[in-house]
Amino acid sequence: MQYTYQHIQDLVPGPTPQNFYGKIIFIKKKINQIVVLIKDETQSIYLRVIPKEDQELEFQLRQVVRVHRCKIQSILNSKEGIAQIGLFGCHLIAWSQSGKVDNPVIISSRSWTKSDEDSERLQTLRKLGKSRRKSGRKTSVDTMANKLIERREAMFADTFIKSLFNKIALSRKEHLSRNARELFYHRPGDIVETQNLLEIDDSWFNDENSEQFVQYVLNCTTCHVEYNHVEYAQNNIPTNCRFCQEAMESFHAAFRIRISIETYGVFLTIPLELIKTELDICEDWDSESNIVEEEEKVTRFKKNIQEKVRDASIVHIKGISSLLLIIMLNINSISLVNNITENKRILLQKSNVPSSLQLKILITPFVIVVVRFFGITWIYSGSSCIEEVLNLIDNCSRRR
């Protein structure tokens, strides 16, 4: 079979196998392959030689190589040859610096044939850099080639790893989005099965953050149902509704919970008048009391909530209408959480949970859901907020 040989500078990356000659000027052995830098009178190219499993190829510097049916690919804005011996007829022949044409030192295929161009190419390539190498010392060419190979491999590895991590991150975001969708896509009263515990960020219960987890909330009873609108009081003073301009008569303090999730945060704000606990850590709230009395109750509640709700985890969500918090007051209570079987419906009855560790928060349609998604905050409230939050998560996922 008559082969057509190209100069290295004329090699074109693509699926078509190509044939060429070159002189080895650098060798670097890898685990399952050999990287050689070969050159001709036009250019140089890196060649990755992948032998067969039972084959050993001993390359030496200044050998002249003839490569048949080699794949040329583009990598990092340069060309690279891949010679996988035996694949699609790929094979190579190598001659020593002073060997004869009929006596090659490396033969990767038993069916090799001599080409009419062998003699001419051997004479030409043997003259390249004939007197530049000094015995026993590495030349600057070797040092530079070694650095280039290591740099190319590092850049290739970095590019591959970045691409891999981007795919993993995208898959993770989609997974979290689906989990959030499942969390909110339930009617009030439905049971939600959680795959794992949703941790509450206890940093909100520090003294310096007390104003963030206990706040004053204004609810306009005139347009609340129509607009699903809830505002926080400024300086603890009720104001008029910005939609209907009517005075907001409903005024109460609220307990705000932040659930720790990797990519986004979900905030639940529950009016304290709706909290009922067997610990009796707060009294029934009187919405008709004046602001001074409300402030006194909030102060008492702050001191108790920092002790009772620290290190809490949400283990059961009954729709958006109720939460069950297990308060881990000591080491013994941690075993209660560890004994919960994942991926199953979690129903903690009063009989098997000590009353001193149980805090149940009943949430009416007044509940406020504050969703912080990719650094942006939306506030929803009322019984129809579930669909709005669901659409919000979908839209944010598409934009990302």
From Swiss-Prot:
Location of this chain's protein in the cell: Nucleus; Nucleus envelope; Chromosome, Telomere
Name the UniProt record assigns to this protein: Protection of telomeres homolog 1
Key words, A-Z: Chromosome, DNA-binding, Nucleus, Telomere
One BP term from GO: telomere maintenance
Function comment: Telomeric DNA-binding protein, which binds to single-stranded C-rich repeat sequences, with high specificity to the 5'-GCCTAA-3' sequence. Repeat sequence binding can be at the 5' or 3' telomeric end. May have a role in protecting the 5' end of the C-rich strand of the telomere. Acts redundantly with pot-2 to negatively regulate telomerase-mediated telomere extension. Also regulates telomere length by the telomerase-independent telomere maintenance pathway called ALT (alternative lengthening of telomeres). Through sun-1, anchors telomeres to the nuclear envelope in embryos.
Coiled-coil region list: none
UniProt entry tagged with the keyword Nucleus: yes
Lineage: Eukaryota, Metazoa, Ecdysozoa, Nematoda, Chromadorea
DNA-binding found in the keyword field: yes
